[in-house]
Regions:
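Short, conserved catalytic or interaction motifs in soluble domains
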Residues: 104
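Portal/gating segments that form or line small-molecule/metal binding sites
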Residues: 1-101, 111-161
Length: 161
């Protein structure tokens, strides 16, 4: 369940990258955060990041822009030695799921019904059956659920969502 800490890199779309940078970049933090967020903040701040964007001209925060064909770029990232790449957000994971490039899915379910907001995988062109492989109850009441596509049980150099 520690996919972000174990991943070799993070793969974000522009919106998620900008949101994560605003929230977790330690060198620009102006508001004190609760102590329990520090391990996550240090992990995300130090991680290598790849940003898929056709509108950004440059990125920093230990990041590199991904240009060109998404499938080719992600397959190249997955071929690199290591434990894999973690992704998050709404739009990019949908595109990766459509391409069959996600080896593991991790969903954090919070004990709150919002009634609005983006829907994950909205518009997915085909049904994707998943098998639960792990779960973790968090102190906040949230539950982390880890799945793999039903036809797949083990992973290597995964792109996790």
């Amino acid at each position: 369940m520690e996919n972000i800490a174990q991943a070799d890199a993070l793969l974000f779309g522009r919106v998620t990258y900008e949101m994560m940078e605003a929230a977790w970049r330690l060198s620009t933090r102006t508001v004190a955060m609760p102590d329990w967020t520090e391990p996550f903040a240090r992990t995300i701040d130090a991680a290598k990041k790849y940003v898929v964007s056709s509108t950004l001209d440059h990125v920093d925060w230990n990041a590199e822009l991904v240009r060109g064909d998404l499938e080719t770029a992600v397959r190249e990232l997955k071929q690199q030695p290591g434990r894999g790449v973690f992704t998050g957000g709404v739009t990019l994971p949908l595109a990766l799921a459509e391409l069959g490039l996600i080896d593991e899915y991790e969903f954090i379910v919070h004990p709150r019904v919002a009634g609005h907001g983006p829907r994950l995988f909205d518009g997915l062109s085909k049904r994707l059956d998943l098998t639960l492989v792990d779960r973790l109850e968090l102190g906040s009441g949230a539950v982390a659920l880890q799945y793999v596509p039903r036809a797949q049980r083990s992973t290597g150099n995964a792109v996790d969502s």
